[in-house]
Amino acid sequence: YGSCTVNAYVPLAKYIHETFDILDSDVNVVHNVAKHKLENTLIRKFCTLEKSATNLLPFLNKDNFIVNYTVVPYTGVSIIDFRFRLTKATSLENFLSKFEDAITDGVLKGLYGMDEVDIGPEVHNCTTFSTNFIKENIKIIGNNLYMQGYFDTENSVNRYVDLVNFAVTRHQ
């Protein structure tokens, strides 16, 4: 369990690194604002992911990981874009096959969802997924993997519930 951006990035980056070996990565976040804070204007600010990811994932450091985080006066679902530079290129078909297996029946099951096409952000309001990816927008150019998704920033409580349920099973 972590912040909404930590929940969106860390399990995904761990999986991609273990499967395809990450050289460097950057994340672009356009983050919503809670309704009671809407009077604030567009701001760039620090994101929990900037510090947490490099502490949680030993293959990342300040020299190979960047987060661009912008808060916008909007109460809907947030947008997150990932870029991973891989040690060696893989085909889009190979990546999608492995990734779809991982989110359907594998190590990422229950954490991530994927839509074939972009059906807009608001359908992902109150989702239980840390990120909902858009399959048609997943691209590989050279050894760079690009992924776009939506996440409900106010709903990272789902990962807390997962953590509590996990802890309960460990103490029974």
Can you annotate each of these PLM segments?
Residues 1-36, 151-153, 163-171:
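N-terminal Rossmann-like NAD(P) cofactor-binding subdomain of oxidoreductases
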Residues 23-24, 28-151:
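C-terminal substrate-binding/catalytic lobe of Rossmann-fold NAD(P)-dependent oxidoreductases
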